[in-house]
UniProtKB/Swiss-Prot annotation:
<dbReference type="GO" id="GO:0005737">
    <property type="term" value="C:cytoplasm"/>
</dbReference>
<keyword id="KW-0808">Transferase</keyword>
<keyword id="KW-0570">Pentose shunt</keyword>
<feature type="active site" description="Schiff-base intermediate with substrate">
    <location>
        <position position="83"/>
    </location>
</feature>
<comment type="pathway">
    <text>Carbohydrate degradation; pentose phosphate pathway; D-glyceraldehyde 3-phosphate and beta-D-fructose 6-phosphate from D-ribose 5-phosphate and D-xylulose 5-phosphate (non-oxidative stage): step 2/3.</text>
</comment>
<keyword id="KW-0963">Cytoplasm</keyword>
<dbReference type="GO" id="GO:0016832">
    <property type="term" value="F:aldehyde-lyase activity"/>
</dbReference>
<comment type="function">
    <text>Transaldolase is important for the balance of metabolites in the pentose-phosphate pathway.</text>
</comment>
<comment type="similarity">
    <text>Belongs to the transaldolase family. Type 3B subfamily.</text>
</comment>
<dbReference type="InterPro" id="IPR033919">
    <property type="entry name" value="TSA/FSA_arc/bac"/>
</dbReference>
<dbReference type="GO" id="GO:0005975">
    <property type="term" value="P:carbohydrate metabolic process"/>
</dbReference>
<dbReference type="InterPro" id="IPR018225">
    <property type="entry name" value="Transaldolase_AS"/>
</dbReference>
<dbReference type="InterPro" id="IPR001585">
    <property type="entry name" value="TAL/FSA"/>
</dbReference>
<dbReference type="GO" id="GO:0004801">
    <property type="term" value="F:transaldolase activity"/>
</dbReference>
<protein>
    <recommendedName>
        <fullName>Probable transaldolase</fullName>
        <ecNumber>2.2.1.2</ecNumber>
    </recommendedName>
</protein>
<keyword id="KW-0704">Schiff base</keyword>
<dbReference type="Pfam" id="PF00923">
    <property type="entry name" value="TAL_FSA"/>
</dbReference>
């Protein structure tokens, strides 16, 4: 399962990149707005050292303008993936991008039906929002399983990019259910390393190492 970071914070991205564990980045207008920087500048800087997919979202809601914005975003770097909302106008844009060989990430997916429509339009990635579904009383993890089964039934190549991942259990479960990729905030990434037995075990090793002769 590929690991993406859901952030526009350059320091966070560099920390994970230096570990050799980073496969890509997802961003959205809300995340980039927090940086206080120009949208395209942030994407360009990320792409300068992250060579995997970097999702950058269009801001329009009509297909012609989405296509115009997406074409501009795709010029920033070869690894830019144009992020498009899962609405009818978005599907028009996705089809147009697919015909031009431009990768897309269809976002705000909350049903398996939506995921199938996005795949038929030619989406490279589909982003089901696990945590947000949980928030309103639905099973976000079950959605991952449903999409995986449908895609496998028909040999669909669209990659499942699990999003809105809130904690390590989400991370583990989307992996078990066959997500191709997961995107998570830096805070959740840090949690993946944590376990009290790891901490206590390391403390014991460090203490015992003081008794060794090198």
């Amino acid at each position: 399962m590929n690991l993406f970071l859901d952030t526009a914070n350059i320091d966070e991205i560099k920390k994970v990149h230096e570990l050799g564990l980073l496969d890509g980045i997802t961003t959205n207008p809300s995340i980039i707005a927090k940086s206080g920087r120009k949208f395209t500048e942030v994407i360009k800087e990320i792409c300068s050292f992250v060579k995997g997919p970097v999702s950058a979202e269009v801001l329009a809601t009509d297909a012609p303008t989405m296509i115009k914005e997406g074409l501009e975003l795709s010029k920033i770097a070869e690894n830019v993936v144009v992020k498009v909302p899962l609405i009818p106008e978005g599907m028009k844009a996705v089809k147009a991008f697919a015909e031009q060989g431009i990768q897309t990430n269809v976002t705000l997916c909350f049903t398996a039906n939506q995921a199938l429509l996005a795949a038929k339009a030619g989406a490279t990635f589909i982003s089901p929002f696990v945590g947000r579904l949980d928030d309103v009383g639905y099973d976000g993890l079950e959605l991952i399983s449903e999409i995986r089964e449908i895609y496998d039934n028909y040999g669909i190549e669209t990659q499942i990019l699990a999003a809105s991942v809130r904690h390590p259990i989400h991370f583990k479960e989307v992996a078990l259910r066959g997500a191709d990729c997961v995107t998570l905030p830096y805070s959740v990434f840090e949690m993946l390393f944590k376990h009290p037995l790891t901490d206590s075990g390391l403390a014991k090793f460090v203490e015992d190492s003081k008794k060794l002769n090198w």
